């Protein structure tokens, strides 16, 4: 557990991570050449060859597809041989369902996809309980894309509401550090037949589950963190809290561009104080969420701090075995909070916390010792001490004392990248908060179908 994991090991730092939690992995099969920041001249010696930096080795065979049910499968691939009778890793066969004009049907593994004809050469790159993700070539845009099919989106109210949120929020946001929607469609033309939802997105090269296994220099660590903060600030500017930040929901390209995805659990700041604590994958769950205090925007700052620390350590910071153990893991390292924090807890929760063993905080110089950081190049303006200082401000149990996104962006460890166009990008279009009232599955189905119909009317989804 204490060692930095190799790319051939399993992922013991993520026990119990569910299939549903990690179905969004987007992993392209193409090779990676280099990580290039672009035209900024803030740092010297940043552009270098990193051909083997980002993507694990692959046989590259078209008839092999990796099942990405969890982060573990990235490092210990389970290969599923897919019938390649037609080439390209897919099996085309007559469909038992009606296939409308401009669509075609393909079977990928055990899943049937009915997609627009503009998307060719589908390959399975991710699968999970809530859906599958395929890469495809968009013959209209002349580029590779990712197509996500949501499995059983109307199985229950929770799935339906999450599907609506994901589709709606993706269509509203417009920021370089948030995954963009390129198209969305359903092959069903009538509401009473509507069951399948497809979302077309940008295809990325890896997620942070893989990047965590790499040895990163300060420039890459800093730039990845800067982009996470920019993307989250964009959501917060519209009053949207992501709530489910984790390495598998953050993806990167070979040029080091980072994007945040999966908005199925996103909530408005207004709602936050009425929300259940069971949001966010456990390891990245903020103390105020664990203790049922309600939360505000900087709940996402805690999650980003956990991810940042994981990038440095190479393993999960607080790998709790259950809800209670998660709190214990946090205070074992950061110490039991003071009385001003405890007084804000509900009486029953406060009584429980006060009766737990008390812990003294371990200094951040010990939690993140110098040998965990890359050596600082003579030409670099970034240091391990700066990174450690920022972590100490993000991983604060009391949310009232935790650093804000805006202040984190001004911190010396990330402000070398500061660009007002990126940081202060126009906020997303407003989200209709009235949609968050309780509704049944049929109502959510109708709302999603209307969204798809409106999208098709205002966009040329075919060509």
Curated annotation (Swiss-Prot):
**Example GO molecular function:** metal ion binding
A GO-annotated cellular component = neuronal cell body
- Any one of the GO BP annotations: negative regulation of cellular response to manganese ion
Q: Which reaction does it catalyse?
A: L-seryl-[protein] + ATP = O-phospho-L-seryl-[protein] + ADP + H(+); L-threonyl-[protein] + ATP = O-phospho-L-threonyl-[protein] + ADP + H(+)
Q: How is it modified after translation?
A: Dually phosphorylated on Thr-276 and Tyr-278, which activates the enzyme.
The cofactor(s) it depends on are: Mg(2+)
Q: Region Disordered: which residues?
A: 1-23
- EC numbers for this chain: 2.7.11.24
Q: Which residues are listed for ATP binding in this entry?
A: 126-131, 148
List Phosphotyrosine occurrences by residue. 278
Q: Where is this motif: TXY?
A: 276-278
The reply on keyword Transferase is yes
Record: active site: 244 (proton acceptor)
The main place the protein resides is: cytoplasm
Q: Which residues form the Protein kinase domain?
A: 119-412
Q: Which residues carry this modification: Phosphothreonine?
A: 276
Task: Enumerate composition-biased segments (Polar residues).
Answer: 1-12
Q: What is known of its domains?
A: The TXY motif contains the threonine and tyrosine residues whose phosphorylation activates the MAP kinases.
Q: Which family does it belong to?
A: Belongs to the protein kinase superfamily. CMGC Ser/Thr protein kinase family. MAP kinase subfamily.
Name of the protein: Stress-activated protein kinase jnk-1
State the species of origin.
Answer: Caenorhabditis elegans
Higher taxonomy: Eukaryota, Metazoa, Ecdysozoa, Nematoda, Chromadorea
